[in-house]
Amino acid sequence: MLKKILFTILCFCSLTLTAQQPDSLSIKNGIDNPSILSTHHFGIFSSRLNTNFKYAPPQKTTFAFNYTSGNNFQPFVEAYYPKNHEIRKQLSQVKWHNRRFNFIDQETTPADYLNIVIDAVIKEFRATVNIPINKQHELGITLRSYLITKGKYPFSIFTSDEGIEWFHSNAVGGEDPFGRRYYGLNQVNFRYFDRNGNTLQLNNNDFFIGGLEFNHYYYPKLSLNTTQNIYLNFGTHLGLNTSKYNSSIDVGISANAIKKLTLKNNHELNLAVGANLLRKNIINFKEVIDLGNNPYLASLEGEIEITKYTKKGNYNAFGINYHIQSRYNKKAEGEYYRLIGKWQEINGGWQNGVYTLYEPLSSWNIIYTYGTPKYLLTLFIKEDLEVNNAPDFQTGVSLKIPISK
């Protein structure tokens, strides 16, 4: 499996680095984050959009490799969606956990049905090339891939089941708050049966190529750039999803704004906000798994970053980032679905596999970057304070280097 991963990465790198020589980065181009997208078990199959908080295109072509690890855990849960409008109306008047619907058969009690269970540590590998077309246009090309694991030491120190449950037991949450110990630690149980009768199943050490993404950014020249130190950019996005479960094309648009403040003692403050809109599955090449019946994914992101420059001209930057994404499924269905799970055996979150598909997903990210003219090294952690556990906790590291034209 490791050989497959290395072969994929080396093939992409060889295509991008051929005839290239090391060069220098133009140091500190806005907030230059790596991909901080979550390892959500639906999201990994689509070409979700990262936010771009740079001031301008890079002066040189850059290559970045990004690795992230996220612990996803949602116990087995079943969902029924009655087709009878009168039954829907009755259920909508009852809180979701008190609803009663006894399915007999499709003729007597017609209803859609699905079930899902997610228990895995998902590893994401991204290789990205950013090419400056000119001083106002940039093209980014990304290859993303995934590895499904049990999350054992030493490869998942912070995102393993043991690490998370130790934190719950000794710091916050209490003993086994979501049922990880009840179901068993360090295992993979990744299965989704959709309402169309299709099954998505992944096993330990399964590796797949998620897709290829093309991102174009336009950086307009405005008087605000010099008078107010405010920078804007606009993106258009095309994603080719290549997994067997979602062979499709996504398209999207984005808009971002960054404010730069120069402070005393070699400090700099950047404030940024961005918005993205993705149209999933605008083209399907074959029948795909139902990864949410909401065709659009919208996201908002904001960040505050403080930078300290060293005497040698390098820098240390700390950022706090908030990200929120729209729900995967249409909100109206959440008014009448019937959920079935082990609510008596599990302390909390037994419903999350379906319930959270009807809720916006948010996360806080803490990002540290060390920048030099030769490379950018970034570390980040992602925490889901809403405890949707998709993922519960995520860590990542990225290395970016310049390559000449």
Pin down the residues of each PLM region.
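Short loop/turn motifs that connect adjacent beta-strands in outer-membrane beta-barrel proteins
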Residues: Q21-L25, S47-T61, N130-E138, K221-I230, ...
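A subset of solvent-exposed loop/turn segments in beta-rich extracellular surface proteins, enriched
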Residues: Q21-N198, S326-W350
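Residues that define the transmembrane beta-barrel architecture of outer-membrane proteins
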Residues: F45, Q59-T61, D119-F125, L147, ...
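Residues on the lipid-exposed face of transmembrane beta-strands in outer-membrane beta-barrel proteins
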Residues: L49-T51, F125-I131, L212-P220, L238, ...
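Transmembrane beta-strands of outer-membrane beta-barrel proteins
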Residues: Q59-Y67, H137-I141, Q228-T236, V251, ...
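Transmembrane beta-strands of outer-membrane beta-barrel pores
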Residues: Y67-F73, L143-T149, Y218-P220, T236-T242, ...
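Outer-membrane pore/translocation modules
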Residues: L139-P295, G302, E333-G353
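Outer membrane beta-barrel transmembrane domains
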Residues: N170-D194, N284-K405
